[in-house]
Swiss-Prot record:
Protein name, as recorded: Major surface glycoprotein G
Pfam families: Glycoprotein_G (PF00802)
UniProt-listed InterPro entries: G_prot (IPR000925)
Cytoplasmic side: 1-37
Native organism: Bovine respiratory syncytial virus (strain 4642) (BRS)
Record-annotated membrane-spanning stretches: 38-66
Cysteine disulfide links: C173-C186, C176-C182
Site (Cleavage): G65, N66
Region feature (Binding to host heparan sulfate): 187-198
A biological-process GO annotation: virion attachment to host cell
Length: 263
């Protein structure tokens, strides 16, 4: 309570309590003088004052308790300093050497395992594994970047093919007469003679043949009206010829004679 005595609300409560004391003393004096009506009004006012003061004190205690219960979200400066002090130092070459030497000393101090049955001795295989772990922890994995070839640059040629291929001297077979050592060279030269590079001819793709179907052509001749009349006359002329035949004439003459006789 000593911390909260300087709060302004507590000061007002103290003043209200003192005023209520004086008020009670005055009521007692009035009761002695038999003034009951005034005493009743004073008691009601005093009861109202006490109730309000109790409500105010309850609100103050609740607000103070909630403020204490809430944790601080942001860390203080002391906490940050403690965290910085507890962080381990980064791995340097000196630290790596010291740890490496300490591990070696511990491994050397351990005696090798001896089999009593076979009489063979063998060292601990943990040295290699521990050294590998330390190297993996100390040296980070180097990220290998693929070589970037600029545009238009040819890829590197394999020089192993040039080194592996042995160039034999060209020995003509005509000079190998009587030399037994020359004949295999001549044969090898013939086998390994560089053949002429084959010429690549690009064949053009044949165009697809399209077979066209023959179309029937109908020719229409225009005939003039004069030509039509000539064709009609040609058709009529043989009939006239038939009528003007000699047999027809004899028949006509006989009919005329018969007619004259009848008359």
């Amino acid at each position: 309570m000593s911390n909260h005595t300087h709060h302004p609300k507590f000061k007002t409560l103290k003043r209200a309590w003192k005023a209520s004391k004086y008020f009670i003393v005055g009521l007692s004096c009035l009761y002695k003088f038999n003034l009951k009506s005034l005493v009743q009004t004073a008691l009601t006012t005093l009861a109202m004052i006490t109730l309000t003061s109790l409500v105010i004190t309850a609100i103050i205690y609740i607000s103070v308790g909630n403020a204490k219960a809430k944790p601080t979200s942001k860390p203080t400066t002391q906490q940050t300093q403690q965290l910085q002090n507890h962080t381990p130092p980064p791995l340097t070459e000196h630290n790596y050497k010291s740890t490496h030497t300490s591990i070696q000393s511990t491994t050397l101090s351990q005696p090798p395992n001896i089999d009593t049955t076979s009489g063979t001795t063998y060292g601990h295989p943990t040295n290699r594994t521990q050294n590998r772990k330390i190297k993996s922890q100390s040296t980070p994995l180097a990220t290998r970047k693929p070589p970037i070839n600029p545009l238009g640059s040819n890829p590197p040629e394999n020089h192993q093919d040039h080194n592996n291929s042995q160039t034999l001297p060209h020995v003509p077979c005509s000079t190998c007469e009587g030399n037994p050592a020359c004949s295999p060279l001549c044969q090898i030269e013939l086998e390994r003679a560089p053949s002429s590079a084959p010429t690549i001819t690009l064949k053009k793709a044949p165009k697809p043949k399209t077979t066209k179907k023959p179309t029937k052509t109908t020719i229409y001749h225009r005939t003039s009206p004069e030509a039509k009349l000539q064709t009609k006359k040609i058709m009529v002329t043989p009939q006239q010829g038939i009528l003007s035949s000699p047999e027809h004439q004899t028949n006509q003459s006989t009919t005329q004679i018969s007619q004259h006789t009848s008359i």
